[in-house]
Amino acid sequence: MVHNISLSSRKALHNVHLPYMVQLPKPTGYNVALKNAAEGYDKARRMVAWLYDIADYESSIPQTFTLQQKTDKYTWELSDNFPPHLAVVPPDQSVSAPSIFSPVRLAQTLLIMSSLWYDDHTDLAPGPEQNTMQKLTQWNQERHKDQGWLIKDMFNAPNIGLRNDWYTDEVFAQQFFTGPNSTTITLASDVWLTAFTSEAKAQGKDKVIALFESAPPNSFYVQDFSDFRRRMGAKPDEELFNDSDGAMRYGCAAVALFYLTAMGKLHPLAIIPDYKGSMAASVTIFNKRTNPLDISVNQANDWPWRYAKTCVLSSDWALHEMIIHLNNTHLVEEAVIVAAQRKLSPSHIVFRLLEPHWVVTLSLNALARSVLIPEVIVPIAGFSAPHIFQFIRESFTNFDWKSLYVPADLESRGFPVDQLNSPKFHNYAYARDINDMWTTLKKFVSSVLQDAQYYPDDASVAGDTQIQAWCDEMRSGMGAGMTNFPESITTVDDLVNMVTMCIHIAAPQHTAVNYLQQYYQTFVPNKPSALFSPLPTSIAQLQKYTESDLMAALPLNAKRQWLLMAQIPYLLSMQVQEDENIVTYAANASTDKDPIIASAGRQLAADLKKLAAVFLVNSAQLDDQNTPYDVLAPEQLANAIVI
């Protein structure tokens, strides 16, 4: 398309002052460089938007394209290391990094990535002198006290390291109910229970065996990362490591067994720091505290057990960052967007329901592929780049749509939706909130799609050729290649569920797995992205571990890795803006020119208001009142993947 710039616009361009081109003096320190970079990014963002508007080039005014035009604009890239994705973001959809991220946080991140060190920059990461956990926690507390009034950094917001009990079994376990990855804890299978029972007998753990025999059915759960090697294309006993970027790092595939009491206390019982295909080939350690009420053990000094818990959370970092967050929200939603743009006309009701939940996702994902994964994730992970990319591709290809619908997912993992408000599950706030949010969103979608104007019966869905084309595009090897997407959608209920799922991924699910990262991950000892010393090869070796062994596993001598581990969660956890939350979406929907959407939007707004009150109660019922669970509160819930 040719864009003509009027004479008056050209004169305006000649006379305009471009603040982002002003020559600034060489910075004298980190804070000065950060201030200059942040101001420059913000000015550039505003100037670029203004220039586009006055030149009438891809302006901020919405444009409508025909289905053929969209098909031509949205093409697949199928030949790089990533799952199928958009080849090139169309100019009218392209959003710059400074418009997506906080300019200050982005500038901080770029300074860290580019290794532009200044004398006072070293304060953002500890050094070898912080060689005990007590020194590390004191350092973290002091950094939070030292925040200036102008330039804020990753220590401006609280993190888990400010808790005196951050390392305890209670706080460790609760992270799998209300932390960044609360989506994968699963009822232990008979196979796992048999394996742990046999190992407990071999190690003479009589109290553990007695608990296995006396506990009610469905009392044991696992966080299971044992399939990492298979999914990454590694051999069962292959050592997982990454020696790029000048720092040797190790990955692990841990398994943690938990006991969930009838009153809802989740307690870790046993850990395999790195599962290598069988229990015999792996190391298994049992908790000295079989009973969660046992206070006879000094948890602070139980270094073998603390090391094992660190392995679990490091494994969880990998699953969360690469799969639960990146793949299962960002990349999967991009496939939905591209397929819908190619096969659904702008006036199609499904397209109209989904489009508001896309916003900056395509530009954000392009940045992730070009920068975040190769320049951040790979340099701090404990797995090689080929293993990481294989892990992501495998997860994308095998993404199981219907089994991940919220009610089905919770049921399959051992959390019956009709029992979520019982004492046993009262601490699983993610499950309680996300299930109610799914029900609310499904009600909204259903009230629109089931209207007689759109799909009065199943036959009207089965006869919709564009819906069938969308299914084909999602499954095709020349499209998204997601063969677990339905081969066809032929009933109203099936369509309602799928549209609800697409909104769920973009809004509540992404919010749940993204916005808690700063709190749980900027304090690196809680959840390191990798281990910086080899893992133990026998239980005898692990049982001899002292504090120095755990400290050696942390990146105290790898400052860049520490900084990236801490900074990226801070970059990605910026507070959701009011115009980006689900409440504003409902308000906008309530004034839609389509009366059906408007009516549904008004009901959605009312339902969200009720949910806000319910979620406050759910958080107040948590045993742990030190860290509220409010990430899914409607006013904090992002309407789309905006960061």
Curated annotation (Swiss-Prot):
GO molecular function: linoleate 13S-lipoxygenase activity; metal ion binding
GO biological process terms, semicolon-separated: linoleic acid metabolic process; lipid oxidation
PROSITE patterns: LIPOXYGENASE_3
Alphabetical keyword list: Dioxygenase, Manganese, Metal-binding, Oxidoreductase
EC number(s) recorded for this UniProt protein: 1.13.11.12
Cofactor note: Three His residues, the carboxyl oxygen of the C-terminal Ile or Val residue, and a fifth residue, usually Asn, ligate the metal, which binds water to form a catalytic base Mn(2+)OH(2) for hydrogen abstraction.
Thermal response of activity: Optimum temperature is 37 degrees Celsius. Optimum temperature is 35 degrees Celsius.
Domain Lipoxygenase: 166-643
Biotech / industrial applications: The oxidation of primary substrates may lead to co-oxidation of other molecules. Cleaves piperine to piperonal and 3,4-methylenedioxycinnamaldehyde. Converts (+)-valencene to (+)-nootkatone, alpha-nootkatol and beta-nootkatol. Converts trans-anethole to p-methoxybenzaldehyde. Converts trans-isomethyleugenol to veratraldehyde. Converts alpha-methylstyrene to acetophenone.
Requisite cofactors: Mn(2+)
Database matches in Gene3D superfamilies: 3.10.450.60, Lipoxygenase-1, Domain 5 (1.20.245.10)
Positions with a binding annotation for Mn(2+): 325, 330, 510, 514, 643
Superkingdom assignment: Eukaryota
PANTHER family for this protein: LIPOXYGENASE
Functional note: Lipoxygenase that metabolizes linoleic and alpha-linolenic acids to 13S-hydroperoxy fatty acids.
UniProt similarity note: Belongs to the lipoxygenase family.
Name this polypeptide is given: Manganese lipoxygenase
Classification lineage: Eukaryota, Fungi, Dikarya, Basidiomycota, Agaricomycotina
Gene field: LOX1
